[in-house]
From Swiss-Prot:
Protein name: Beclin-1
Main location: cytoplasm
A GO-annotated cellular component: mitochondrial membrane
Span(s) of short sequence motif BH3: 103-122
InterPro entries: Atg6/Beclin, Atg6/Beclin_C_sf, Atg6/beclin_CC, Atg6_BARA, BH3_dom
Post-translational modification: May be proteolytically processed by caspases; the C-terminal fragment(s) may induce apoptosis.
Length: 445
């Protein structure tokens, strides 16, 4: 059994660049002392290594192996040299079992020496060892390229040196003449600089005299300025008193003129629009499905509208037929002259009752009747007066004569909120025109 048993020993070194496993040359097995000294000899830029260092390393380094009792194989990993210390870089792996203890010990020592040799070689240069053949060729190519560059630089320096050495005496004389000329220019410029410096000193003295004179004049100016300021202060006080009286008189005159020109109707009733709504004093008259205006605001807008028409009628001395306007804020209404017990409210609270109670619609139609009477009264004295939207009191509609030509009902029943809102907007526009006419007739005069 022992004679048929084969013993296998295998060592694994890796390339320090590509980390590929290496197969060492057989020459590593027969290293004598002379070869060791040649391989480990230091470079010119490296500190000298004593010949006995390698032997000392060999004699001091002790390696231990972990042996598996089950298969009798000793194993150890050899990492790359750049990531190891000098001692750990000598590690290797043995696979198999030696024939006897003495052979195993000699092999271990030889492999330690090989590992130490690679570490020493790595310490002599900037390249880590060992390297595979391909990485070695690549390294040699890089070194050849660097050598060619260095040789080219050396040749350039040599050519420059030859050019400098070939310079003749004429060039030297020309340079000396040029140097002499420059020296003369330097002396001339130094003299000019000295002259300028002397002139600068004279100018500095003149400046000092002028500065002293300026200080004296400034002191006199300050004294005169102080006296002037005192007189000016007294004058300003008197001017302030005079201007104060003039401003008071001017303000009183402006207020008087403003009161004379003030149009009470324009100042009290501001009719405008906000989107699709007509507004009076910023109260919107109408409502839309997308903008459900509160009824309190609509009632307040109706109250302002009734008050406006009532004021215009009083200014003209107009007495409405069939109805009397009763402005009471957001609870304004119309009183029937034929039936005084009958009141037509121009306010509403909404809700289900709103759809069945037509008094609100009757009140709006009655108000439209009053606007029509106002229009007819104005046309009696001014035939050229015309409201922008024609009103049909019998149908309770307002026609857009200048636009689409359609008519819009002022009633809420059987009517859409959009058309009702547009009819109210047209009615406010007519009132705005009536307000402008009254203002032009009674206030511009």
């Amino acid at each position: 059994m022992e004679t048929s048993k084969s013993s296998t020993m295998q060592v694994s070194f890796v390339c320090q660049r590509c980390s590929q496993p290496l197969k060492l040359d057989t020459s590593f097995k027969i290293l004598d002392k002379v070869t060791m000294q040649e391989l480990t000899a230091p470079l010119v830029t490296t500190a000298a290594v004593k010949p006995g260092d390698i032997q000392e390393v060999d004699s001091n380094i002790e390696e231990t192996f972990a042996e598996n009792r089950t298969d009798g194989v000793s194993r150890r990993l050899i990492p790359p040299a750049r990531m190891m210390s000098t001692e750990s870089a000598t590690s290797f792996t043995l696979i198999g079992e030696a024939s006897d203890g003495g052979t195993m010990e000699n092999l271990s020592r030889r492999l330690k020496v090989t590992g130490d040799l690679f570490d020493i070689m790595s310490g002599q240069t900037d390249v880590d060892h060992p390297l595979c053949e391909e990485c070695t060729d690549t390294l040699l190519d890089q070194l050849d390229t660097q050598l060619n560059i260095t040789e080219n630089e050396c040749q350039n320096y040599k050519r420059c040196l030859e050019i400098l050495e070939r310079m003749n005496e004429d060039d030297k004389e020309k340079l000396e003449a040029k140097l002499k000329e420059l020296a003369e220019d330097e002396d001339r410029l130094i003299q000019e600089l000295e002259e300028v410096e002397r002139n600068r000193e004279l100018v500095a003295k003149d400046i000092e005299k002028v500065r002293e004179e300026a200080e004296r004049l400034e002191q006199e100016e300050a004294r005169y300025q102080k006296e002037y300021s005192e007189f000016k202060r007294q004058q300003l006080e008197l001017d302030d008193d005079l201007k104060s009286v003039e401003n008071q008189m001017r303000y009183a005159q402006i207020q008087l003129d403003k009161l004379k020109k003030t149009n009470v109707f324009n100042a009290t009733f501001h009719i405008w629009h906000s989107g699709q709504f007509g507004t009076i004093n910023n109260f919107r008259l109408g409502r839309l499905p997308s903008v459900p205006v509160e009824w309190n605001e609509i009632n307040a807008a109706w109250g302002q509208t009734v008050l406006l028409l009532h004021a215009l009628a009083n200014k003209m001395g107009l007495q409405f037929q069939r109805y009397r306007l009763m402005p009471f804020g957001n609870h304004s209404y119309l009183e029937s002259l034929t039936d005084k017990s009958k009141e037509l409210p121009l306010y509403c609270s909404g809700g289900l009752r709103f759809f069945w109670d037509n008094k609100f619609d009757h009140a709006m139609v009655a108000f439209l009747d009053c606007v029509q009477q106002f229009k007819e009264e104005v046309e009696k004295g001014d035939t050229g007066f015309c409201l922008p939207y024609r009103m049909d009191v019998e149908k309770g509609k307002i026609e857009d004569t200048g636009g689409s030509g359609g008519s819009y009902s002022i009633k809420t029943q059987f009517n859409s909120e959009e058309q009702w809102t547009k009819a109210l907007k047209f009615m406010l526009t007519n009132l705005k025109w009536g307000l402008a006419w009254v203002s032009s007739q009674f206030y511009n005069k």
